[in-house]
Each structure stands twice: as structure tokens, then as C-alpha cells.
Design a protein with these regions (language model features):
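Conserved structural core of kinase catalytic domains
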Residues: 112-147
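Conserved kinase catalytic-core helix
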Residues: 133-171
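Regulatory N- and C-terminal appendages and interdomain linkers associated
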Residues: 1-47, 59-65, 160-166, 208, ...
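Short, glycine/acidic-rich hinge or "gate" loops at secondary-structure transitions
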Residues: 113-114, 162-176, 301-308
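Active-site acidic catalytic loop and adjacent metal/ATP-binding pocket
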Residues: 47-60, 69, 215-262
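Conserved NTP-binding catalytic cores of kinases and kinase-like/nucleotidyltransferase enzymes
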Residues: 1-119, 244-249, 359-360
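Active-site activation/catalytic loop segments of kinase-like enzymes and analogous catalytic loops
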Residues: 94, 256, 263-298, 315-336
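Active-site catalytic-loop/activation-segment of kinase and kinase-like phosphoryl-transfer enzymes
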Residues: 3-5, 9-14, 167-220, 323, ...
Length: 360
């Protein structure tokens, strides 16, 4: 895809140029339209993985104050280049500008969303104190899992068949193409690097399956990214969820949003957000619940056996995503350690690589 090298060139030039514009000044300009004149900005805490993020208190001229969550480009050049090449920040901004108000799931209130081709700023409500934000190493409770499965079914029913090329949602399909293009070059070396870092955390048989998956990415992609498509979150682990009253979920971090198969979200969530024993005992119940809810919400009536096979195949992607996350340092190590343990157990239990029928 020609836009990938063009994006890399633009971002590389911007990194070399640098920025002398303080975050406080940018926040004042960004929030003027939605909140009014900003008198002072107090930063609370900050961190950086795929993007740089901070919590801040904004003091307004009217005397009110508002706590916000701000996302800006990563301060690590290699991470920023990879994230922009994948179109992730542009996708999240586009989601909040075009879809956030219409999806049937809870998302943070957006106060500002802008991407200019090289830099971006996203300002969201700060959920601290209003919703529970689990640590990424935690596992969902049974009640939380049921609520997330219901919400995913509602989201997928809403988005079923919506992403179409040449239409307003065509960018969601373009993200599939971009992921496939980058995977051609990066999937195998990143898988090797991630497995090297994981060491004995990934059993040899599972590591061999992961490498076979990476070498045969074209065959795997045809099975995992083909039609029918719906709108998927595409990164639904517990670190990207918050829970409100009665454990109703709120979905965070939409930078991976795209068109895709329903099983991508369901298998990813069950694989990475559930304790392996809970997943083993509850995944069939969750799958049946998902199918019934999807159909009741206006989606298709999925065949039970075909749904189970799709779920098995997509668990392999959850493992691949975790290995790649480890390779590029896109999450804290304690989080990737927890996800690796869950993902290796899932692909082993479900015989996921065999379900993909990949050549040796």
C-alpha cells in the first residue's frame, strides 16, 4: 500500500523537526470549543506505550474544573513510526468523530479528536472515580464476562454488513488491507523476536505453531479476515475495558477498530480476559449466549458448530497479537506475561493451529 511509506516519511520528518508547543497550550486550544476558556492545566500522571497518555485537571474561566484523559503521539520514535504506519491513531480519531455517538455500547465522552497526518490529540473524559478500571493483569468475573459478551453481540449486530468499500465506512475495510500489508513484512520477524523474549513462557509446541502461523500468514488471513464483516473493536482485553454500575462495560482504546469477523472480538476477549479455568468451564455458555443475543439484536443466526470452529481459529490471533505486543514493548511486561499464559493455554486447549489447517 503506497500510503504506508508516505506516512512513515511524513512522521519521520516530523520526529526530526520536533515540537516546541507545550501540551498545556495545545490543550487550551483543543478544549476551547467544548469547554470554554481554559485558565490552567494541572498534569496528574502520564505514561507511554503505543501512544503517550496523561491525566490532567483543566481549570476553566467559569470556575469549574474538569478531569480529562489525553492521548498524543508516543515519545519513542520507533513506536510512533509503527503506530502511524498501521494507521492506528488516525483510526481512533475517526472512530470518535464518526461512530462513537451511534454505536450501541458505552464509550468515553470525547471532548476533542484531531489528526493532521503526522500528529494527533485525543481528549476524553477521565473515568477515574466514576468507573472501575481493572489492571491489565486481572481476569474478568463471570458477571463481567456475560456483560461484555452481550455488549459485543450488540455492537456486531449494529455493524453487520455496514463496512463497504466506497461508502462512509470504507476506511474500516482499508484498515484490514493495511494490517495485511504490514503483516507481510513484519509478522514473522516480530513473532520470532516475541518468542525469543518470552522464552520458556511459550511451550515449544505452541511456539512452533505460532511460527507456522506467521510463515503462512496469507492462508491464515484469508480465513480470519474474510467476509462476512461487522464492526469490531479488535483489541478487547481487560485493560481496554472499564466497568460501571452492575458491571456494565465501557470500551476503551479504539485505535484497532476495523471491519472484521465477529469471532475476532469474542475469541480475543475470552482468551485474554478470562482465567483459563473459567474460560474452559464457561466458553461454550458464552458462545451460545453471544449467538442468541446477536440474532435477537438483528444479526444473523449463526450455526453453533461453525461458530465454535471460528472461535477456535481466532484464538490463534490472540496469541499472535500478544507475542507481537511483547516484541515491540507495547504493554507492561507483567501484562504480556499474564496474557501469554492465558493465550498459550487457549490455543492448546482449542487446538487452534490445527483448526486453521496450515501447511507444515
Amino acid at each position: 500500500m503506497r500510503e504506508v511509506p508516505a506516512t512513515v516519511a511524513r512522521v519521520a520528518a516530523d520526529i526530526a523537526l520536533g515540537s516546541s508547543d507545550p501540551i498545556e497550550a495545545r490543550l487550551r486550544r483543543a478544549l476551547h470549543a467544548s469547554l470554554g476558556t481554559v485558565r490552567r492545566v494541572d498534569s496528574l500522571d502520564e505514561g507511554s506505550h503505543t501512544t503517550h497518555h496523561r491525566r490532567a485537571v483543566v481549570h476553566l474561566a467559569c470556575g469549574d474544573r474538569r478531569s480529562v484523559f489525553v492521548k498524543t503521539p508516543s515519545r519513542h520514535p520507533a513506536t510512533r513510526l509503527l503506530v502511524e504506519a498501521a494507521g492506528l491513531t488516525a483510526s481512533e480519531v475517526r472512530f470518535y468523530r464518526t461512530l462513537a455517538q451511534s454505536v450501541p455500547v458505552r464509550v468515553p465522552e470525547c471532548l476533542h479528536a484531531r489528526h493532521d497526518g503526522t500528529r494527533f490529540m485525543l481528549v476524553l473524559e477521565d473515568l477515574t472515580g466514576t468507573d472501575r478500571l481493572p489492571a491489565p493483569t486481572e481476569a474478568c468475573t463471570a458477571r463481567q464476562a456475560l456483560a461484555v459478551i452481550d455488549a459485543l453481540a450488540d455492537l456486531h449486530a449494529y455493524g453487520w454488513g455496514r463496512p463497504e468499500r466506497g461508502r462512509a465506512g470504507g476506511w474500516l475495510l482499508a484498515q484490514v488491507d493495511r494490517e495485511r500489508s504490514l503483516g507481510t513484512w513484519l509478522r514473522l520477524p516480530l513473532t520470532r523476536r516475541g518468542l525469543e523474549l518470552a522464552g520458556d513462557q511459550v511451550p515449544r509446541s505452541v511456539a512452533a505453531g505460532a511460527l507456522r502461523y506467521a510463515r503462512n500468514h496469507g492462508i491464515a488471513d484469508r480465513q480470519l479476515t474474510g467476509t462476512p464483516h461487522t464492526l469490531i473493536h479488535n483489541d478487547c482485553h481487560i485493560g481496554n475495558l472499564a466497568f460501571g454500575e452492575e458491571d456494565q462495560p465501557l470500551f476503551l482504546d479504539w485505535q484497532m477498530v476495523r471491519a472484521g469477523q465477529w469471532a475476532r472480538d469474542v475469541a480475543y476477549f475470552c482468551t485474554l480476559a478470562l482465567d483459563p479455568d473459567d474460560r474452559r468451564s464457561g466458553e461454550d455458555l458464552l458462545l451460545d449466549r453471544y449467538r442468541r443475543r446477536l440474532h435477537a439484536a438483528g444479526g444473523p443466526d449463526l450455526d453453533a458448530e461453525e461458530a465454535r470452529d471460528a472461535y477456535r481459529r481466532h484464538a490463534a490471533y490472540a496469541l499472535e497479537a500478544t507475542i507481537v505486543t511483547l516484541a515491540i514493548g507495547a504493554a507492561p511486561r507483567d501484562a504480556t506475561d499474564a496474557w501469554l499464559a492465558r493465550a498459550t493455554a487457549a490455543v492448546d486447549d482449542l487446538d487452534s493451529f490445527a483448526a486453521l489447517n496450515l501447511p507444515g
